[in-house]
């Protein structure tokens, strides 16, 4: 059965210009992984998943392919590619260009569907801030990736873990004959359903994760030596003593040569380090694979929310050691001072787009546990103003204070001085912009970028007045550990 009906669509078309048409099918013999592997050969596709509390899969996994637009931006040039093969270039602020494209769509919000049922999926890079702030000391761009890259998709598969069903969603564009468009959407749903049922996929790939203790140790290189990183920490501490900043986040980029199957790396990562934001994004010649624990900003039903994370410890080997490390973390004056500072920064960022008096702190300084580390986390919420959009909320926070510092602009100037290369996607945002007005994004951390036979992993540490350089250097490696392990484990998938 297809929902909504043609008659219902005709009524909705008076108020909306893009309407999701959906059919539910049983999926008790499928997984999100088996589904996605049917469509991974598409040049641009994505898989979004989520784990709640570090241990329970969230209700929905979302698969997208066959985008009708792909938008990528380099400085002031944005390339827009259409599904029919045509493309054009537009000059100007890429955020405003994507905002303009999204502004053309007014999507219907149907009940019983997830937050995202069609729209744009991709990333905004850290360096987009240069379109809003004067940061003249631009580091070298050694990776050559777009400042932002988005797939606009009107075909989505939603795997419902609770009901063990798949929502096959095709968005109908209201731009002509409604009946013809509805029939076309229904036909497309039927085609996708046949692809799901195709028995060739049942035996095409029966690879499994097998854990062989004898693994080849990865040859990991960094773009900065330990001595130089520690020297930069001392320089940052001098800026703090001089009163320039209270805190700054310094990072290093690790690199590993690999020829492992990219999707197998994602499969290993989702087992090793399940997180609130799991993503596999395929953009033609490169892929972004991640398990970010940290929300950047979410806008849903008029509520705007951010979730600062600051304060980290390694997980203990036993329950008792784990609890002792939690107690140590929550009594660490340096970590708590840094966290409170970033919560205040989050309140200020949310306040710029929220109604007066609605900004509130929720769940102050609670602990969230992941496979290799634990973090101190706080939620900040507000009611978004009528004159503000989800884009305004996103740009009020990007880049997050937890990846830049405080005050934010001066901290970013110091990052440009001390880090030798542009951050690219790292420290920016990955997420979706839905046709129905919802936005959800995470900070691009705990992320692997695969390009030209190399895997890049970037991680940082928050520097404050009493930081110990060697400990900050080690924190970067602690944060990268799960990602490097996933690359190792991918080689064990047989």
Curated annotation (Swiss-Prot):
Required cofactor names: Mg(2+)
Keywords: Amino-acid biosynthesis, Aromatic amino acid biosynthesis, Lyase, Magnesium, Metal-binding, Tryptophan biosynthesis
Functional description taken from the UniProt entry: Part of a heterotetrameric complex that catalyzes the two-step biosynthesis of anthranilate, an intermediate in the biosynthesis of L-tryptophan. In the first step, the glutamine-binding beta subunit (TrpG) of anthranilate synthase (AS) provides the glutamine amidotransferase activity which generates ammonia as a substrate that, along with chorismate, is used in the second step, catalyzed by the large alpha subunit of AS (TrpE) to produce anthranilate. In the absence of TrpG, TrpE can synthesize anthranilate directly from chorismate and high concentrations of ammonia.
Name by which UniProt lists this protein: Anthranilate synthase component 1
Transmembrane segments: none
Any one GO BP annotation for this protein: L-tryptophan biosynthetic process
Catalytic reaction annotation: chorismate + L-glutamine = anthranilate + pyruvate + L-glutamate + H(+)
Subunit structure: Heterotetramer consisting of two non-identical subunits: a beta subunit (TrpG) and a large alpha subunit (TrpE).
Activity control summary: Feedback inhibited by tryptophan.
Cofactor-binding details, from the entry: Binds 1 Mg(2+) ion per subunit.
EC class: lyase
Binding site for L-tryptophan: 50, 276-278
Pfam families per record: Anth_synt_I_N, Chorismate_bind
Family classification: Belongs to the anthranilate synthase component I family.
Keyword Iron: no
Pathway recorded for this protein: Amino-acid biosynthesis; L-tryptophan biosynthesis; L-tryptophan from chorismate: step 1/5
Coiled coil: none
Species of origin: Acetivibrio thermocellus (Hungateiclostridium thermocellum)
């Amino acid at each position: 059965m297809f929902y909504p009906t043609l008659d219902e669509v005709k009524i909705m078309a008076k108020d909306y210009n893009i309407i999701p048409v959906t059919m539910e099918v049983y999926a008790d013999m499928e997984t999100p992984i088996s589904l996605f592997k049917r469509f991974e050969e598409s040049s641009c596709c994505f898989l979004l998943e989520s784990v709640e509390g570090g241990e329970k899969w969230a209700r929905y996994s979302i698969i997208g392919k066959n985008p009708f637009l792909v938008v990528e931006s380099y400085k002031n040039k944005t390339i827009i590619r259409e599904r029919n093969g045509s493309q054009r270039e537009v000059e100007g602020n890429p955020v405003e260009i994507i905002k303009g494209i999204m502004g053309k769509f007014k999507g219907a919000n149907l009940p019983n569907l997830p937050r995202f049922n069609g729209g744009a999926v991709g990333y905004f890079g850290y360096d987009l801030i240069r379109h809003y702030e004067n940061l003249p000391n631009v580091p070298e761009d050694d990776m050559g990736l777009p400042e932002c890259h988005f797939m606009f998709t009107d075909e989505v598969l939603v795997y419902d873990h609770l009901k063990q069903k798949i929502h096959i969603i095709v968005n109908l564009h209201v731009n002509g004959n409604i009946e013809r468009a509805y029939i076309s959407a229904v036909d497309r749903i039927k085609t996708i359903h046949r692809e799901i049922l195709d028995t060739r996929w049942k035996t095409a790939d029966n690879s499994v994760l097998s854990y062989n203790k004898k693994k080849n140790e990865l040859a990991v290189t960094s773009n900065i030596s330990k001595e130089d990183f520690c020297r930069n920490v001392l320089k940052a501490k001098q800026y703090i003593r001089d009163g320039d900043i209270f805190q700054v986040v310094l990072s290093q980029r690790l690199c590993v040569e690999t020829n492992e199957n990219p999707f197998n790396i994602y499969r290993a990562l989702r087992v090793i380090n399940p997180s609130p934001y799991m993503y596999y994004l395929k953009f033609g010649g490169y892929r972004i694979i991640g398990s970010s624990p940290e929300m950047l900003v979410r806008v849903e039903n008029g509520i705007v929310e951010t979730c600062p994370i600051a304060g980290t410890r390694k997980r203990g080997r036993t329950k008792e050691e784990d609890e002792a490390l939690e107690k140590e973390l929550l009594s660490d004056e340096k970590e708590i001072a840094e966290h409170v500072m970033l919560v205040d920064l989050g309140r200020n960022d949310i306040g710029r787009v929220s109604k007066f008096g609605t900004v509130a702190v929720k769940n102050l300084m609670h602990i969230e546990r992941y496979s290799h580390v634990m973090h101190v986390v706080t939620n900040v919420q507000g009611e978004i103003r009528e004159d503000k959009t989800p884009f305004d909320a996103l740009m009020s926070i990007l880049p997050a204070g937890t990846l830049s510092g405080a005050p934010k602009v001066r901290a970013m100037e110091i990052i440009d001085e001390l880090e030798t290369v542009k951050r690219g996607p790292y420290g920016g945002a990955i997420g979706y912009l839905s046709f129905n007005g919802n936005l959800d994004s995470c900070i691009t951390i705990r992320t692997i970028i695969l390009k030209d036979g190399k895997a890049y992993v970037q991680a940082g540490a928050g520097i404050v007045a009493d930081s110990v350089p060697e400990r900050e250097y080690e924190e970067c490696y602690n944060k990268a550990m799960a990602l490097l392990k996933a690359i190792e484990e991918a080689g064990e998938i047989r």
